[in-house]
From Swiss-Prot:
Protein name: Argininosuccinate synthase
Residues engaged in binding L-aspartate: 121, 125-126
Any GO molecular function: ATP binding
Primary location class: cytoplasm
Amino acid sequence: MADNKRIVLAYSGGLDTSVAISYLKERTGKDVVAVSLDVGQGGESLETIKQRALACGAVESYVVDARDEFANEYCMKALKANAMYEGVYPLVSAISRPLISKHLVRAAHQFGADTISHGCTGKGNDQVRFEVSIASIDPTLKAISPIRDLSLTRDVEIAFAKEHKLPITQTEKSPYSIDQNVWGRAIETGFLEDPWNGPTKDCYSYTDDPAFPPVEDEVVIEFKEGVPVKIDGRDVTPLQAIEEMNRRAGAQGVGRIDLIEDRLVGIKSRELYEAPGAVALITAHQELENCCLEREQHRIKRDIDKRWGELVYDAQWFSPATQSLNAFIEDTQKYVSGEIRMVLHGGRAVVTGRRSDSSLYDYKLATYDSGDTFDQKSSNGFIDIYGLPSRVAAARDVKFGNGIEVPENTVE
């Protein structure tokens, strides 16, 4: 049985976490197991990252292609919940942290570790998301951050790498702090911390300039119980649906987001995001729900969706509250099946058509033309009953001299 003197490190392959392998071992005396996940972020292959981790001193390197798992079990939950924190942010980073945490815990159990390390600062949301998620899965594990807890600054990293001759090619530091996956991309940088400064073109990667779009792109997305299953008649998996909509909506500049965001840790921050596939799919899904959900159910779900997004943003993916909301949301999706036609153009995803066998839209009831089956005479009795509380309250107000004053007609 493996000893319990190891640390599992969330390893990205970059300078920070490459240095952290040897730094953690030197500072704590524990061997380090590097854990890397592919959640659709692109870049280097998992094999390249694995070999770099071993070359930097990791005793084991645990790598996982988690793209389908992420799309199926995390992105689709966010889609069904129409998750938009503060009305605009589709939780790009927030939904990946619970998945990464799950694999960190799995690796800790597999390799006999008692501590999990991540690369977060003490100022952001992700430190909370990782550590609360880890504690929710296995509360016996400890969590540390070299940057936050062991004073691992970038200057220390560079000096440490040179001194220990670590196999890391040091390139000019990008001015941007990037976190990306298949659901979207988060961009932070020093000059954007002034909220008056506009983003420059080189901030963006997933989206083209919406001011210069190509010819409009019409797409038909078919959903089954809230999940996209076909695009333009072709079968797709959730991952394929997200990837295709990233390409097509991104080419039209859809999904650029620039906001002042209320962070979990209590500060406001300026955030820049790109999420073309997420924004287009959520727009389509919301419109299908407009067709298929009963009015009161739909009203309640809109409130639940908002709260779900807040809980997940606030590191509560595994909480009992979120699990209960998941059950409600999943139940609402049993009739959310059908097709949505959208036009992607100039930064917008506009729904132009919808059809569903389970739609509650009834043409014969809605039309004002011949064939109308709605009995308009029924409205008289409905209005009498519906307006009764207002009439009773108005009569009381008049009785006590508080009736609504109507100005005299001054027209001569």
